[in-house]
Amino acid sequence: MSFSNAPISFPGLFGDWQFTVPSKALNIGSGIYWYGIIIAAGMLLGLYFCMKQAHKYGLSEDNVIDTVLWAIPLSVIGARIYYVLFYLDLFRNSDGSINWSSTYRIWDGGLAIYGGVIAGFLTAYLFSRRRKISFWALTDCCVQGLFIGQAIGRWGNFMNREAFGAATELPWRMRLWTSTTTYMDVHPTFLYESLWNVIGLLLLYFIVSRARRFDGENTCFYFIWYGLGRFWIEGLRTDSLYLFHWTLFGQRIRVSQALSLVMVLVCAGILVYQFKVKKADGSNLFVKRVQQTTEAEEAAAEPTAPDEKQ
């Protein structure tokens, strides 16, 4: 059932007041959608924030800009491919063949964040190798912008009336009207995830990043924090992507929950290894190595005073 342009209300918070926000911002050509505008705004704000943080990680603003300018389009492509692969039945014609023309209509919604993250991190890895900079320092800087982009981008789902949760009677439930007399009360999961990302950003910026002891620590925190939140929120949603037709204990396996669990376990293992085995203390951070190299080059470039005549 499509809820595009359906009236919205929050009866537990605002009573009978309802409002309608069109999914299209401008009717130019096939239309300019709020979904795309909001996602683009999130990306740009995330990029700006990362640029201003770059020096703290031994990076230049150009490093961040060049990485993100490549990562953004490739991440969108990755997010769409991921969504299409796991929701392939939605893109089939009545005879079972794939309707290829519908696979690229991203303005109608249908981007899977994990596909975008995978593509973005692969781009960052290739870029870091080419520029000879630390991949983990680069991702430590960029995950801050990723939190920002996701927190803002989830409001694109709100504009499309998608990615909501199961029926609920909680006070903050969101009501989607299908007619003047029929409606659905659901979990506003887009809001849950947006707030979860905002909290993650605050914890990362004010606590984790200021006590960073190894390159990759911010990245591990991002995957653990986002993974825990996504595992919980995904269980509330009704439009989950499933791992083909595989089941566990009689239940179909949700792709995002499976990936979230793997991410949390792997990154928790990395933290234990770094702190307990390698005894990471921050002395080998990329930013410190860059500072030491710069100081050595400046010292070598200083003119040597001529010997005094005897």
Language-model-derived ranges and their functions:
Residues M1-Q310:
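A feature for loop-to-transmembrane-helix boundaries and adjacent hydrophobic helices
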